[in-house]
Amino acid sequence: MFDKTQTIADFDPDVWQAIVDEGVRQEEHIELIASENYTSPLVMVAQGSKLTNKYAEGYPSKRYYGGCEYVDKVEELAIERAKALFGADYANVQPHSGSQANSAVYAALCAPGDTVLGMSLDHGGHLTHGAKVNFSGKMYNAVQYGLNPETGLVDYEEIAALAREHKPKMIVAGFSAYSQVLDWQKFRDIADEVGAYLMVDMAHVAGLVAAGVYPSPVQIADVTTTTTHKTLRGPRGGIILAKANPEIEKKLNSAVFPGGQGGPLMHVIAGKAISFKEAMSDEYKAYQQRVVDNAKTMAATFIKRGFKIVSGGTENHLMLVDLIGKDYSGKDADAALGAANITVNKNAVPNDPRSPFVTSGLRVGTPAITTRGFGETEVVDLTNWMCDVLESLEAGNSEAVIADVKAKVLDVCGKFPVYGSN
């Protein structure tokens, strides 16, 4: 029998200390990694619930185990809310991650060796869009498109030319590091011209789409995938959405279970259901608009300070700071900002001369700082502090500047707590 009085701190102080330390890090560091956010306490409670105990292979009312009447209700709520939130006719809420959602779509719509056209990783795509180190580039004949070298924008003429030349079975639209609005209809037109499926990976902008501040691909693409964290601000996981097509829906369900996964994580699906309900509120819609407003303010401040932003600015939640030609690398910048308690990630930029482990760019995003309550004033201050740190790497006075910025970061973090004390 379990000891109800025992705490993690009592039983496993090593793990507990790591949990406490991570909580302190989240409170005392400014989070600018574009794919990270702070989920709500309600979602975290659901993920720590007794639903974690229940195996539920299959789908609601079609399980391979008994005792699923209550987890069926949870999954049905998640499905219906996902469909309502995104205007979808179909939703599968079981994928454990965005990558697994993408893998299921590949398995459902393509055969090994089929040609897939996706965005190059070093131009802002994702591993699962055809990168050679990923299943999508190993199991399939991946052809890659990128950005126009002069404009820094997605080159639809190149995509159309590649599609006509290679006749892909599926075109993948979406990104992990692109700061502009994609024209989903142009992708649809290209796919229709060559007889390809269109899959959209909207993992990075799903929250913006849910709030209506970024165009929705759901009724344009054959299939749309997303993570449930990032801008959506739910638990870590994935979902698959689609417009009505019984044949595709059947293939997608089979590709998730039993094709790629066994039992779904019912405690996480409960968290997804709660986060979808949160995303239906007016407060959430206002939050997503502030995410975009803050990103635009940040990009404008970087540009004002003389830094280059890939694509010339941002129309979503993220941007790439181009450091090509600087004496320091993306890795150097990442480390220096981290020492000042500002968390970013080094990122390759188009035509990057440095290796992917070093890079000549930074990817930054505003979802987490907006959740925290930052507005225009805080974003301008923060961006200027970042510029001060980056400039100090060339000026040779980085130690003093980093110490000064860290003190400012700790002060503003104290004024804008995430969850408060642990």
Curated annotation (Swiss-Prot):
Residues that coordinate or bind (6S)-5,6,7,8-tetrahydrofolate: L121, G125, H126, L127, S355, P356, F357
SUPFAM superfamilies referenced in this protein's UniProt entry, alphabetically: PLP-dependent transferases
A Pfam family it matches: SHMT
GO molecular function terms listed in the Swiss-Prot or TrEMBL record: glycine hydroxymethyltransferase activity; pyridoxal phosphate binding
Keyword Ribonucleoprotein attached: no
Disulfide bonds: none
Cofactor or coenzyme needed: pyridoxal 5'-phosphate
PROSITE patterns assigned to the protein according to its UniProt record, in alphabetical order: SHMT
Reaction(s) the record says it catalyses: (6R)-5,10-methylene-5,6,7,8-tetrahydrofolate + glycine + H2O = (6S)-5,6,7,8-tetrahydrofolate + L-serine
Record-linked InterPro entries: PyrdxlP-dep_Trfase (IPR015424), PyrdxlP-dep_Trfase_major (IPR015421), PyrdxlP-dep_Trfase_small (IPR015422), Ser_HO-MeTrfase (IPR001085), Ser_HO-MeTrfase-like (IPR049943), Ser_HO-MeTrfase_PLP_BS (IPR019798), SHMT-like_dom (IPR039429)
Modified residue annotations for N6-(pyridoxal phosphate)lysine: K230
Transmembrane segments: none
EC number: 2.1.2.1
Chain positions of site Plays an important role in substrate specificity: H229
One GO BP: tetrahydrofolate interconversion
UniProt keyword terms in alphabetical order: Amino-acid biosynthesis, Cytoplasm, One-carbon metabolism, Pyridoxal phosphate, Transferase
Location of the protein in the cell: Cytoplasm
Broad class of where this protein is predominantly found: cytoplasm
Pathway given in the UniProt record: One-carbon metabolism; tetrahydrofolate interconversion; Amino-acid biosynthesis; glycine biosynthesis; glycine from L-serine: step 1/1
Domain of life assignment: Bacteria
The family this protein is said to belong to: Belongs to the SHMT family.
Subunit structure: Homodimer.
NCBIfam families xref list: PRK00011.1
Free-text function comment from the UniProt entry: Catalyzes the reversible interconversion of serine and glycine with tetrahydrofolate (THF) serving as the one-carbon carrier. This reaction serves as the major source of one-carbon groups required for the biosynthesis of purines, thymidylate, methionine, and other important biomolecules. Also exhibits THF-independent aldolase activity toward beta-hydroxyamino acids, producing glycine and aldehydes, via a retro-aldol mechanism.
Name the record gives this protein: Serine hydroxymethyltransferase
Organism listed in the record: Teredinibacter turnerae (strain ATCC 39867 / T7901)
Gene name, Swiss-Prot/TrEMBL: glyA
